[in-house]
Amino acid sequence: AWQLKSAEFSAEEPKEAGFLLANMGAFALYDLRIAGFSAQEITNAFLLNKQIIGSLEILKNAGFSAKDLSEVTKPDETEKLYTLQNLIKAGFSAQELKYAGFSAKELKDANAEFSAQILKDAGFSAQELKEVGFSAQELINAGFSVKVLELINRLSNDKKLYLNKH
């Protein structure tokens, strides 16, 4: 890999030529990501080489998203390698985690620091936040209007009436 890098090959060229990722350790993770290697491929190569990635933060800093990393499985493909807690510790924001597919409930349950305000800013609705247990006052403090909360209550009551009749 050092010979490739010192010969001024980009990470894309050895990839196109069919070089194995496990033999491209001289390239920065960022270069490997730009070359088109997935988070799964990079993680598998490090695991196969018995190398330890210092932390998930390295992959994050290489430009992999929470979504990319949340989809990485263990080599036997039976379960996810990186948990929501791992992604939070690596510094991913509530918005990045929402984009990765995590629900408001999962985020609230995983981290007491994810307030109604933070989850609202991440793009969750007042209804979603109410359903996971935030109080009306917390929702108002997060910037939702009283009218929005009244509408949620009205819709909730209408739904209950409908379900009771059918």
Regions found by a protein language model. Name each.
Residues 1-4, 9-14, 19, 24, ...:
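Fold-core signature of tandem repeat domains
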Residues 54-56, 159:
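Short amphipathic alpha-helical segments at helix boundaries and their inter-helical linkers
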Residues 74-76, 108:
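Extended non-catalytic scaffold regions that mediate assembly and binding
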Residues 151-166:
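A detector of long low-complexity, disordered segments enriched in serine/threonine/proline
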